[in-house]
From Swiss-Prot:
CDD domains: PPM. It holds the Pfam family Metalloenzyme. Its EC number is 5.4.2.7. Its main location: cytoplasm. Binds 2 manganese ions. Belongs to the phosphopentomutase family. InterPro entries: Alkaline_phosphatase_core_sf (IPR017850), DeoB (IPR010045), Metalloenzyme (IPR006124), Phosphopentomutase_DeoB_cap_sf (IPR024052). It comes from Moorella thermoacetica (strain ATCC 39073 / JCM 9320). One of its GO terms (molecular function) is manganese ion binding. GO terms for biological process: 2-deoxyribose 1-phosphate catabolic process; 5-phosphoribose 1-diphosphate biosynthetic process; metabolic compound salvage; nucleotide metabolic process. The gene is deoB. This is Phosphopentomutase. Isomerase that catalyzes the conversion of deoxy-ribose 1-phosphate (dRib-1-P) and ribose 1-phosphate (Rib-1-P) to deoxy-ribose 5-phosphate (dRib-5-P) and ribose 5-phosphate (Rib-5-P), respectively. One of its GO terms (cellular component) is cytosol. SUPFAM superfamilies: Alkaline phosphatase-like, DeoB insert domain-like.
Amino acid sequence: MKLDRVIIIVLDSVGVGALPDAAQYGDEGSNTLAHIAATVDLRLPNLTRLGVGNITPLRGIPPVGTPAAAWGKMASQTAGKDTTSGHWELAGLILERPFPLYPHGFPPEIIEPFEKAIGRRVLGNKPASGTVIIEELGAEHMRTGNPIVYTSADSVFQIAAHEEVIPVEELYRYCKIARRLLTGEHAVGRVIARPFVGEPGHFIRTDRRQDFSLEPPRPTLLDAVIAAGLEVMAVGKIKDIFAGRGISRWIHTHDNMDGVDQTRNFMREGERGLIFTNLVDFDMRYGHRNDVAGYAAALEAFDRRLPELLDALETSDALILTADHGCDPTTPSTDHSREYVPLLIYGKRIRPLNIGVRPTFADLGATVADLLGVPYDLPGKSFASMLLE
């Protein structure tokens, strides 16, 4: 007998140790969760009970003799360490080539057609921290009306604009234009709208960010679940990451706690299928800013909410906690890190056992399909037979 429902929660960037090829990405020695625990007095009693301390050594978070969940970790086989490819691999789509990166900004063959299409010049066109570049160029943007374009170590084309200078809907239109232009060798993973408000010296990015992702080039777990007549409910930026494909219902969120609330709301409805949630604050607000204390506080805040999710599980449910990459806030880099991701699987019918090290995130997609009884022929090897009582 299979399960009725699986809830996947991606703790965005909560990596658990450098992958063997991490040095190729400049990430040798990274371990997001362990280094946070080594730096601050991290207390995660509920995750500890599930077995997070059994996955990787954590100061102050010991392994437990009998974890409440199945535990393990997964390696990535995708080329890259970004949000989109990480989530796609979780859903059974492994990319052989990484998305293009622009460490020196975007070339004229990208910028010139974009400027012509929107009827404005762009400011910036370089890699930058989003909060830094709006402080640097925000006043000029307000004076000229020209949007700020920037990138990062991720495959992203980001457009920042003050909401009173370029209305948000117009900013979204610019992003759709960029998305249409960024194809072929320049097919970046995401075009991102980054609206902000305020005055020079006091700019604040708003929660009206929107991602315009590439559509997955091949089917994913989400398509398989929909094809089987089940629901796929997306919380947070999941809908954007998959460009809306394979999703029956979705809701954006303001922050991690809203993400937990919206996940609970979908759970209350009792629909059969998949709830797929991304909690982005760990990465966006703390990892990229090297804010160790903030990252730790966000982990503890999620840990306090975890019992609500566990208590809401029905007999034929499973809750899966994992991540998409690392973003070690204790290293000089402010970029993602190439890491293993944790795997905790809890449910009334789930055996609490050591899953070990899975060779690809795609094993999770195959396992979820198996747990739901969904026909599936994508990459990855199911370990569902280990899990079910």
